[in-house]
Amino acid sequence: MKIRPLHDRVLVKRNEAELKSAGGIVLTGSAAAKSTRGTITAVGNGRVLDNGQIKPLDVKVGDVVIFNEGYGAKTEKIDNEELLILNESDILAIVE
């Protein structure tokens, strides 16, 4: 199945969380929280401005991003893969 986000939304595949602390301790349970990094797999056309123009998104397919999984985030399971649908404003940074 193919998903195409609308407007200023993006589709993100969450990267695996690090299961060891910086000191080498293996993290389990709530300490091993879900990663807030992921890879953009699809993007919408852009945000519609008040004057009707479309502002292209700052992220593109393949970008690794740090995101805030907040109020607007939607998790979907597609082809046995968990993906997030986020607004571009939920993306905090691009990892370069």
UniProtKB/Swiss-Prot annotation:
Which domain of life does the UniProt lineage start with?
Answer: Bacteria
**Keyword annotations for this protein?**
Chaperone, Cytoplasm
User: Where is the major localization of this protein?
Assistant: cytoplasm
Single GO BP term: chaperone cofactor-dependent protein refolding
Give Gene Ontology CC terms: cytoplasm
GO terms of molecular function: ATP binding; metal ion binding; protein folding chaperone; protein-folding chaperone binding; unfolded protein binding
Write the signal peptide boundaries.
none
Coiled coil, from the record: none
- Could you tell me which PROSITE patterns the record lists for this protein? CHAPERONINS_CPN10 (PS00681)
Subcellular localization is given as: Cytoplasm
What CDD domains does the record tag this protein with?
cpn10 (cd00320)
What Pfam families does the annotation carry? Cpn10
Instruction: Give the family this protein belongs to, as stated in its UniProt record.
Output: Belongs to the GroES chaperonin family.
Q: Which HAMAP family match?
A: CH10 (MF_00580)
Quaternary structure, per UniProt, is:
Heptamer of 7 subunits arranged in a ring. Interacts with the chaperonin GroEL.
Q: Briefly, what is this protein's role? A: Together with the chaperonin GroEL, plays an essential role in assisting protein folding. The GroEL-GroES system forms a nano-cage that allows encapsulation of the non-native substrate proteins and provides a physical environment optimized to promote and accelerate protein folding. GroES binds to the apical surface of the GroEL ring, thereby capping the opening of the GroEL channel.
Name this polypeptide is given: Co-chaperonin GroES
